């Protein structure tokens, strides 16, 4: 506006400076208005801001530092599985206490210390001793149930026929329903033949014995012909609306029935375990046989409860339409 060498007023330079000043103000006002308009109701992406970049870089540095801190320990554990298992066992509180499952569920999919809980609230596996049900109920009182004890109970059932009346009453109810399809015989003959076929698969009796020994006294068992393999399969129907199988009970069930699949399922409102032969597995053939005729004679001398037989007839009517899982 003024020349440095003199105080002579230069109108041309003054007009140019005014134009520059006005253009700067207009540009600033436009940018401010544009920034205000662009932020009305619209989320501004600030991922490219310097502060965001610094925060992301800082976070990555912290993660890398933590990874480097434990990398030697984790690499050592990965190369020494036995030490890794020992470290996991020393954990007081498990990392995961429950895992949701869907039905049908094969019990062979469980791992060590997995309990099974079924109820209207859901189906899940729990870590033994840490699952909510185990925390409340505690450890079950299980008697000896190794292979020798199961075989002894199977052989001596003739002398303890009243104790296993729930198992034998199902045979009478199934014979009354006409289980022996295509066989024209009296109800007594059908019952004896069905009993012989069921006793030819000792694992079915073993599963029933283990469940009763595990505290499930009122479990009901149903016998149906297995069309996929020769023989019969058994449905163990639970009387309650919720079921909890302790991991020790599951281990005993699986150990008692080699060559069989045990699958948890639900039908209408009843939870059931389906015990059936596995086509690709061999069963134990070194089990003494028992006389079905002698046991049936004892059954004829025993007066079965009419309510128990009626309950079985109703259960057979309910499960006639049930399709067992493969």
Curated annotation (Swiss-Prot):
Zinc finger (CCCH-type): 115-244
Disulfide bonds: none
One annotated Gene Ontology cellular component of this protein: membrane
Keywords for this protein: Host membrane, Host nucleus, Membrane, Metal-binding, Phosphoprotein, Zinc, Zinc-finger
Main localization category: host cell
GO MF, one annotated term: zinc ion binding
Cell compartments where the protein resides: Host nucleus inner membrane
InterPro entries in alphabetical order: Herpes_UL31 (IPR021152)
Example of a GO biological process term: viral budding from nuclear membrane
PTM summary: Phosphorylated at serine residues in the N-terminus. This phosphorylation regulates the localization within the inner nuclear membrane.
Record note on quaternary structure: Forms a heterohexameric complex with NEC2. Interacts with capsid vertex specific component 2/CVC2; this interaction directs the capsid to the host inner nuclear membrane to initiate budding.
Family, similarity comment: Belongs to the herpesviridae NEC1 protein family.
Function: Plays an essential role in virion nuclear egress, the first step of virion release from infected cell. Within the host nucleus, NEC1 interacts with the newly formed capsid through the vertexes and directs it to the inner nuclear membrane by associating with NEC2. Induces the budding of the capsid at the inner nuclear membrane as well as its envelopment into the perinuclear space.
Protein name: Nuclear egress protein 1
Gene responsible for this protein: NEC1
């Amino acid at each position: 506006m003024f020349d440095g060498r003199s105080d002579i007023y230069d109108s041309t330079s003054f007009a140019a400076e005014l134009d520059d000043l006005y253009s700067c103000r207009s540009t600033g006002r436009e940018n401010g208005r544009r920034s205000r308009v662009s932020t009305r109701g619209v989320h501004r992406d600030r991922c490219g801001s310097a502060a965001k970049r610094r925060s992301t870089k800082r976070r990555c540095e912290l993660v890398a530092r933590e990874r480097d801190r434990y990398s030697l320990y984790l690499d050592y554990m990965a190369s020494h599985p036995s030490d890794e298992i020992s470290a996991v066992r020393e954990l007081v509180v498990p990392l995961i206490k429950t895992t949701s499952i869907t039905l049908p569920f094969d019990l062979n999919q469980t791992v060590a210390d997995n309990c099974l809980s079924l109820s209207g609230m859901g189906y899940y596996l729990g870590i033994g001793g840490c699952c909510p049900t185990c925390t409340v109920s505690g450890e079950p009182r299980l008697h000896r149930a190794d292979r020798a004890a199961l075989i002894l109970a199977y052989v001596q059932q003739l002398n303890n026929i009243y104790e296993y009346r729930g198992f034998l009453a199902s045979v009478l109810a199934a014979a009354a329903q006409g289980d022996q399809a295509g066989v024209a015989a009296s109800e007594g003959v059908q019952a004896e033949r069905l009993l012989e076929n069921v006793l030819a698969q000792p694992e079915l009796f073993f599963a029933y014995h283990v469940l009763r020994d595990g505290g499930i006294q009122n479990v009901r068992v149903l016998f149906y012909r297995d069309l996929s393999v020769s023989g019969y399969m058994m449905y163990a129907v639970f009387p309650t609306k919720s079921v909890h199988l302790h991991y020790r009970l599951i281990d005993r069930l699986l150990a008692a029935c080699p060559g069989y699949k045990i699958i948890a399922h639900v039908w209408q409102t009843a939870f059931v375990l389906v015990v059936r032969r596995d086509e690709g597995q061999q069963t134990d053939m070194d089990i003494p046989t028992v006389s079905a005729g002698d046991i049936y004679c004892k059954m004829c001398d025993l007066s079965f409860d009419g309510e128990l037989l009626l309950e079985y007839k109703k259960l057979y009517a309910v499960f006639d339409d049930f399709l067992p899982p493969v």
